[in-house]
């Protein structure tokens, strides 16, 4: 039988404690997000699955895979396509493919003509999304958990289940964040 040094056992125990803490925090964050989202947990799972299925369907088209950059976001069965395509034909084909995926009820095709953005722009988009989410979180005009934010090449896209007043407020808040070039909304309005 192999003997373990006391130092190795101690280090392993400490590392495992860190893993447990990270797992607990991660699980709590996911649980909180699921609980505050106005969609049912089932709908949230369906939307996540739909995003994967649409992305997979798009990647099966070799020309789309090689020549475009397309990100997929789903909210209550509505699919948002953002990114870049060298021509409108590929953009239209991407929309057609997305519509053919089971579970898709509507497609918002916001793919822009142009060359795919680079890593620097994509990183900046992530930063813009973080800033928009932070502003929505601190606003008393919008329930931030009702709004899904994605950014592509400085353009912010907002989806969600909101009142008209919340939708206008969310768009206004996003438009005031530095680095935002344009705000596009695709809300489902509730009374």
UniProtKB/Swiss-Prot annotation:
<keyword id="KW-0564">Palmitate</keyword>
<feature type="domain" description="BON 1">
    <location>
        <begin position="46"/>
        <end position="115"/>
    </location>
</feature>
<dbReference type="InterPro" id="IPR007055">
    <property type="entry name" value="BON_dom"/>
</dbReference>
<dbReference type="InterPro" id="IPR051686">
    <property type="entry name" value="Lipoprotein_DolP"/>
</dbReference>
<keyword id="KW-0732">Signal</keyword>
<keyword id="KW-0472">Membrane</keyword>
<dbReference type="InterPro" id="IPR014004">
    <property type="entry name" value="Transpt-assoc_nodulatn_dom_bac"/>
</dbReference>
<feature type="domain" description="BON 2">
    <location>
        <begin position="124"/>
        <end position="191"/>
    </location>
</feature>
<keyword id="KW-0449">Lipoprotein</keyword>
<comment type="similarity">
    <text>Belongs to the lipoprotein DolP family.</text>
</comment>
<keyword id="KW-0998">Cell outer membrane</keyword>
<feature type="lipid moiety-binding region" description="S-diacylglycerol cysteine">
    <location>
        <position position="19"/>
    </location>
</feature>
<dbReference type="Pfam" id="PF04972">
    <property type="entry name" value="BON"/>
</dbReference>
<dbReference type="GO" id="GO:0009279">
    <property type="term" value="C:cell outer membrane"/>
</dbReference>
<feature type="lipid moiety-binding region" description="N-palmitoyl cysteine">
    <location>
        <position position="19"/>
    </location>
</feature>
<feature type="signal peptide">
    <location>
        <begin position="1"/>
        <end position="18"/>
    </location>
</feature>
<protein>
    <recommendedName>
        <fullName>Outer membrane lipoprotein DolP</fullName>
    </recommendedName>
</protein>
<keyword id="KW-0843">Virulence</keyword>
<comment type="function">
    <text>Plays an important role in maintaining outer membrane integrity. Contributes to virulence.</text>
</comment>
